[in-house]
Amino acid sequence: MHETGLIFTAMMPVFFIILAGFVARRVGWLNEAADRSLMNVVVNLLYPAFIFSYVLGNDALRNPIDAVLPPLVGLCSIVAGFSISMLLARKLKIGDQRECRTFAFSTGIYNYAYFPIPIVALLFDRETTGILLIYNVGVEIAMWSLGVGFILSANDPKPLWQRLLSAPVIAILISVPMNWLRVDQHLPDFAFESIDLLGKCAIPLGLIVIGATFADLATDVRLFERLQIPLSAVIIRLAAFPMSFIFFALIIPFPDELKAVMLIQAAMPCGVFPILLARQFDGSPEVALKVTLTTTIVSFATIPLWIGFGLKLLNL
């Protein structure tokens, strides 16, 4: 019961900040013109600062193997998610090719950053949050390399290496060796305080933009038409995938910090970023929104159940 209360405590701010972004858009405080600049600040400044604040001085990341295994697990989870979701999209006859690709991309990738980071930070120690950030590098690589095959590759003129080297990935590539070399021990206190303050802004601001995006698309989407799309996404993302994640965490002797990360990621709904990609490139925004919005709403009930079950089963 205590664990369930902690999980709800970690979840509630996330949902309320998203709601705040939704309201801010609807009442006109946050317009669409501001979205791109805000996300640029989050992705290129605040989120890298967040990464530095959790990686530097993190003893759990001093071992080089900890910089290899978590990203590998994260990458494999997304590759499997995309592959299974595409196969099922075709079997279930979700729609035309464009809609199947969007369904596979949206269902195959979970909300790997904005939701799990505050939950992990509250339920586990600082070292586990660091492992989560390293794990997410593998997710990013899979999303940009394999994911673009569903939505981006035909239209994005940038070469693959430019898409892979996002600011968060660069921050990981710099901060991990700095942590190995214990450079943090030679930095002044004001540098850490500045990085920490910037990093604390990343998640709230990103969630506000997510809420605003929901507000934009919710008015146009016909949520209760073609119910096989959201229902299939809920079954795949919030039932089948969590069971698979927890099963592999149970049978494979991963470190406890990585098992904790796998558990939290297992419970996550579909990611929001596919909505933005489908909106800008050759995807179906309606399919992406149905998948993301439905799994996000349902996850409010399923996240505590899966995390509570996994904590006991994995003895975390």
Can you annotate each of these PLM segments?
Residues 1-316:
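Alpha-helical transmembrane segments of multi-pass small-molecule/ion transporters
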